[in-house]
Amino acid sequence: MVNEVGEMDSVSPDDHNNSGISVFEIDSPDYKLNFLSWILDITQEEADKGFEFLKRNNKSIEVLWDLLENLKVFTVVVEDHYVDRVYRDSYYFYYSGKHFSYTRFCKRLSIFDGKLEKNFFDYCSEELQQKFVGTIVIRPIPERSIGRTLLSPKYFLPIDKNGYVRLAKYVVTVFGKQLEVWAFPYGMQDGETTSCAEVTILNLLDYYSQSYPEYHYLLPSEISHLVEKSSFERRMPTTGLSYELISKVFCEAGFYPRLYSAKKMPKNKFRHILSYYIESGIPVAIGLKIAEENKHSIICIGHMQPEKIQLGQILNCANNSESDNVVWVSDTADLVDTYCFMDDNKRPYNISECVEVAKLNTSILSLDGFEVEYMMVPLYKRMILEAADAYDICMSVIASPKFGIKSFSQEWDSETKKITWKY
């Protein structure tokens, strides 16, 4: 491949065999590109068009290249005949009926930080655990090949700023070695059995079913059958789902979801509600408007640490209607504008700002330049109060002359009063 990464050489597992398994040590951009081209079955004709052409026209190359950019030297253990439950389900209810032939098997990449100095089987699980980054499933589907991916965020989040994300514990077995990874699941849509909407459902249910015994996982065929009950046309190949249908699927999965529209409330309130749920440890689905007829769905799983120096610069009024008491409150939701997302068009743990911008004599919430339209929150059935109601109750209590801040503020010294509240 002619470009800044040099020419493409052939890569095969036979060249890197480690006691019967395929082990690759990636220590240069050249070799990383060669490996990705081999694992994704890039033809020589495509490779000859250059690195930039591949990044523009193959989403899997683009995402994997960006994802592995932070790992300067790493080792990949490849399992050739891996059975992935999501792809195998899609294969039997859709791909097996197509005219073209698709294999039933995937490849799974197990990634380790640095080089493995010894034979893979000479390591014990505890030694491998210290280097374990996670796993990536490669489906036998052109262009959108990345399947279920479980990666530790510590290798991919910014090292110069703290972040807070929701993760679940996954146990994986790599050629008999049992390893653990704390991750939020990621995967790409295949464009036929799954769109971004179905991927949002799959990854959220994967996280919740892994974290809490009350929930169970749904496969693509099960999601399709649930949606068919509320649809008036065929579901395969998929054309995507509305956020009303996404919410309906979560109802069927045992959740009591709450659906918010950014157009039906002040943008500042919508942004506050997003912050409240994320700060409460509840991953949510976000609906974006890419173009007039083009929508996209992603998952918000956390936020970056806000700058505390901004505390107190934005104040919100809490008033009590009975006594006319007024208290000015600094809401930490005003400090958070940088969130962590799982977007199947980008690498896992993508960091983006959610800000309010002016557009055509109005204002919209913008995320990476796209308008935020919806937020779907998969709530537990016992969570009676949703965020907006809980906020109103808290603000009324704060301003209450009987139970609020003023009821016990007389016990504070003057310095505490100065930095904590003011009339």
Language-model regions: role of each:
Residues N3-G6, S10-E52, L179-A262, E415, ...:
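Cysteine-nucleophile protease catalytic domains, especially the papain-like/related folds used
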Residues W65, Y92, P220-S224, S247, ...:
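Generic detector of well-ordered alpha-helical segments enriched in charged/polar residues
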Residues F132, S145, I159-D160, A168-K169, ...:
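Short, well-ordered loop/turn elements at secondary-structure boundaries
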Residues Y164-V181:
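Active-site-adjacent bridging/hinge elements
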Residues V172, W182, D190, F270-H272:
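Residue-level detector of functional hotspots within protein domains
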Residues V174, Y186, I201-L204, I278, ...:
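Generic hydrophobic secondary-structure signal
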Residues S247-V327, T332, T338-Y339:
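Active-site-adjacent substructure of cysteine-protease-like catalytic cores
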